[in-house]
Amino acid sequence: MAEEYELNEIDDTLHGSVGSRLSLFARELKSRRSSSWHGGTALRLPKDLYESLVIHPNGRWYRIWANMMFLWSIYSTFFTPFEFSFFRGLPDQLLDLECVQLVFLADVAVHFFLAYRDPHTYRMVHDKRHIALRYIKGSFALDVLGCFPWDAIYKVTGRVEAVRWLVWVRLYRGRKVMAFFKRVEKDIRVSYLLTRIVKLITVELYCTHTAACGFYYLATTLPPAREGGTWIGSLSLGDARYINFREVDLLTRYVTSLYLAIVTMATVGYGDIHAVNTREMAFTVVYISFSIVLSAYLIGNMTALIVKGSRTERFRDRMTDLIRYMNRNRLGSAIRSQVKDHLMLQYESSYTRDRVIVDDIPVAVRSKMSQTLYLDMVSRVGLFRGCSDDFLSQIVLKLHEEFFLPGEVILEQGTVVDQIYIVAHGCLEEVANGEDGSEEIISELRPYGIVGDVAVICNIPQPYTVRVCELCSLLRIDKQSLTSILQIYFKDNSQILSNLLKGKETESKRKQLESDITYLLAKQESELVLGVNNAAYHGDIFRLKSLISAGADPSKSDYDGRTALHIAALRGYENIVRFLIQRGANVNSIDRFGNSPLLQAVKSGHDRITSLLVEHGAILNLEDAGGYLCRVVRGGRIDLLKKLLRFGISPNCRNYDQRTPLHIAAAEGLHLVASTLIESGADIQAKDRWGNTPLDEGRRCSSKPLVRILEQARTVATN
């Protein structure tokens, strides 16, 4: 595609002399003898096309032919108005010039075999039927009409004036001249300033040349008796008079007409040559009006050359810098070709410039634009199916559109990937590369497909190489942007992991991903629980609400079995406890240490939270009530003991030695604790594994008040 401006090697002195530029052209011509048909990119044609007679547009011989046709197009474009105005039928000595039309007829035949690049897919089309249909629907009719011998037809039809006008169809060949200048403007080997100046001079000369022919045509189409009333018939310059101007030599007549056209375009005043009759005046009015527009065009282009602000010049500067960089680092031809093709695609599509413009728009407005452009497409991507609208809105805001040419590799197998691509237009293919260098096409990706998702989400190397089949428009989102969004929308994170597993049709793919996704789900769940518990620990109810609204489960426990309700009850945050209960948190969950939320509230002395939990069905739920109550008694925590007894713990529960809390209180001499236990119904006659009663323990302790309390309790129990 970009062979016109590509160089295999280029000196850094690009702004040198004309001689150095010619030497560059010579070296380039030699280096292209065998580079047109071979190569692995999708922009090149198969090697067997010689047999099918399809011509490559970048082939050496066709380029020579195209340059030759460019020269003949210049001749035809300039000679056509000259022939129309100065000859009413070509004289015999110029009839041989009509043979040139055979060259253009041959060019018509060549176009039936000339491969072309599809503007939508960027693939080279080499099917002769498609080539012929495209050419017939395009410029075929005008090209063929231009090849007709209109001079001979004019003479055969009795010199009908309308037939002469048909010769103007040959001006359609001027498109070859415009295409040449457009191509040279992008050729970094040629001075951009010189190219633009030559182009502008050519435009100016052609306009004045055509106007000169028009002025002369107006004079020759009047009857001979009225030719004295024309601009040239009435002309008198010094001793020369043009009364019989047809007898004046051809060169003098043309130069005189050209002088009139240039003076009129320059609008230097009403000179010695001027319009005489009404037709000439009307033509002059139209011509001067056109010259004003042309002058503005010329001045505008010269101004753009001075300020160096044109898009083409920026492209040339960037291409020059890239080629210097690639030459300095001796990059391979495949990489060079891919870089140049991609830069050319950017230039033709101008999408990078548009993206810069969008970046300057406020985020709120850009968000609405992104939703309008991409939301429908993203919602139809399998990976994001079932995700919330808020999540999708954040995704589309981070998307960037990129274009890729056929043959380009988007992702390589085994590499670390940090972006995900959504196919907006075009076609990709996933290819598995074997150890022996073989390739196996795994799948073909069309619009709404996605690549890089497995590698990015599962944090694994890219499993397959992803290659462009036809010109693609891809929507890219960076891994960092996606990760930051997923950290906020936890529920959508789980949905994406589920979609990722469902989206892999084959059993082998599913088995490969199951372990990774299971690990990610467990990791995500543990991180989410830690986030919820951390918010509960610090009393941050707003953060807690956002986490639960995003999909966090308030009943999930951390590595110690603690839930957010455990922590809130321990820390005394009544508003958080109330919120968690409203969100369905389990009020009777037990951590690995045997603590329930109610027990945590009781131990911490948060009476209001205790009442709130009991009101919603919470119980102490002690697995080893006897052992725990005995430890409370041994610690002398009488207030906690009273609360535990009030919430249903039996005073006669036993520890592993069958000792009751009253045994412990008697052994430790805690008469106040013993009184509390007796008042709560403790059995004074209970025996431990050694047959000892609380009274026996009290007597060994030698605490007279305690013994007296125990004996009174025994007497009461006996009676």
Curated annotation (Swiss-Prot):
Gene3D superfamilies: 1.10.287.70, Ankyrin repeat-containing domain, Jelly Rolls
InterPro entries associated with the record: Ankyrin_rpt (IPR002110), Ankyrin_rpt-contain_sf (IPR036770), cNMP-bd_dom (IPR000595), cNMP-bd_dom_sf (IPR018490), Ion_trans_dom (IPR005821), K_chnl_volt-dep_EAG/ELK/ERG (IPR003938), KAT/AKT (IPR045319), RmlC-like_jellyroll (IPR014710)
Pfam family, one: Ank_2
Transmembrane residue ranges: 64-84, 94-114, 138-158, 165-185, 200-220, 286-306
GO molecular function terms listed in the Swiss-Prot or TrEMBL record: voltage-gated potassium channel activity
Cell compartments where the protein resides: Membrane
Function per UniProt: Probable outward-rectifying potassium channel.
Protein name: Potassium channel KOR2
Lineage: Eukaryota, Viridiplantae, Streptophyta, Embryophyta, Tracheophyta
